[in-house]
């Protein structure tokens, strides 16, 4: 990946163009959110501008968000080729539905994070139409959701101390 990126940068320089930075030392990131801000900036920006924000961003889940969640679950169920994957997804959706039905706080939390998860899953699907890449996207989305959940209560939130930066860097890697 780095090789053909370097070739593209070199050819652009030979032609007199200056390309934007696409990777900004992501492995020096102090948290998961910072990692994704630094990693593959052109793709991340495209996913944010043309997928995440039109679906509602972190403010709300739209009809499109939930429709896309259904499509992704259907797609994953079909390519998994096993009976238990749709059953697991059905149970997961039932738990989310019941939680949102009986708790307005949980519903707001789901609405705020469904678009983030969908964007990461679809970003994984963009890398390859296999279950491995979809799971990779889902795990990264889950990491971002967990980070958003715990960043305000984290004892390592103060990045002015060297040991907090070290802990954040270690957890991110």
Locate predicted features.
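Membrane-embedded transmembrane alpha-helical bundles that form the catalytic cores
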Residues: 1-173
């Amino acid at each position: 990946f780095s090789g053909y990126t370097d070739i593209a940068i070199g050819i652009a320089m030979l032609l007199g163009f200056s390309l934007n930075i696409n990777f900004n030392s992501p492995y020096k990131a102090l948290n998961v959110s910072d990692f994704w801000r630094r990693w593959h900036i052109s793709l991340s920006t495209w996913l944010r501008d043309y997928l995440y924000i039109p679906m509602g961003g972190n403010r709300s889940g739209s009809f499109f968000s939930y429709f896309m969640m259904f499509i992704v679950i259907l797609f994953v169920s079909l390519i998994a080729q096993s009976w238990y994957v749709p059953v697991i997804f059905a149970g997961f959706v039932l738990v989310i539905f019941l939680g949102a039905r009986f708790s307005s706080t949980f519903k707001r939390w789901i609405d705020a994070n469904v678009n983030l998860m969908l964007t990461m899953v679809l970003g994984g699907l963009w890398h390859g139409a296999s279950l491995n890449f979809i799971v990779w996207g889902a795990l990264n989305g889950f990491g971002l959701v967990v980070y958003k959940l715990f960043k305000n209560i984290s004892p390592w939130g103060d990045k002015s101390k060297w040991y907090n930066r070290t802990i954040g860097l270690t957890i991110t890697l």
